[in-house]
């Protein structure tokens, strides 16, 4: 029996690099000091945009750093914080992490407004209306004139350069930029595109919740409309239950008066406030009765005259007469009104 001897190799795991240990501890410290971790997506984000962003927000956001995703996961784990599943799923690719105690919604709004102009590339989608302004382009006449013609931009040659005759819209929001248009815009020095930092979301430690970008960046106009609608609904509810606050009581009193007036008119209760409505109601009922009787009304000698529309008062004398008649009407007593109604309906 032969003995077979072999070499047994043992695997020695390389020691965790010192710089990684230091960075994980740094992230742990920032997690301890701050309530919010904002995550920005750096995939396909130009370096000059990141540089300008850092420069603009350096004082406001002292700690913003590109960190490997696994090191952030490690820092959460060692801090005893369970990373939400939604956040873990977003930690792919290159990301910038911002640690802060600022309101995440306000911060996201500020970041969403930060942008940098950029030239249009073929295949880009126009974000807004693109206008080529009238004036001297500084370009010399040549084959480029055919490009202007293809894009329906009217031109003329003056002093050896191409002049655009009038402001021309060359693209509307949603239009795809053609190679010809992209080339021309670059030659004219027009940078119609806007580059922005892409927000993935924010982790709020006090809530142990991940807030995605679509919930983080608020549409202020939409929220304003919702608040206005909520206020209107609350006011309507307050009026319906007569809630005793100044804003509601003004409307509640007016509503109570209208409701009381309606009930009084329905009940035929005669007062100076209900008299005009009662007369109108009685007159309408009389017209309806005559209409229902048809020819029989004439046989019975019942006629109701439809009052003619008052003629416009052209002279001062007519105005005075009208005022006098109005005063006479006001002097009619409640007894006379009651008698008139009684006579009308028998």
Curated annotation (Swiss-Prot):
Gene3D superfamilies: 3.30.70.1730, 3.90.105.20, 6.10.140.760. It comes from the Archaea. GO terms for cellular component: cytosolic large ribosomal subunit. Residues 305-346 are annotated as: Disordered. Residues 322-337 have a biased composition (Acidic residues). Pfam families: Ribosomal_L10, RL10P_insert. Transmembrane segments: none annotated. Coiled coil: none annotated. Keywords: Ribonucleoprotein, Ribosomal protein, RNA-binding, rRNA-binding. Part of the 50S ribosomal subunit. Forms part of the ribosomal stalk which helps the ribosome interact with GTP-bound translation factors. Forms a heptameric L10(L12)2(L12)2(L12)2 complex, where L10 forms an elongated spine to which the L12 dimers bind in a sequential fashion. PANTHER family: 60S ACIDIC RIBOSOMAL PROTEIN P0, LARGE RIBOSOMAL SUBUNIT PROTEIN UL10. This is Large ribosomal subunit protein uL10. The lineage of its organism: Archaea, Thermoproteota, Thermoprotei, Desulfurococcales, Desulfurococcaceae. The gene is rpl10.
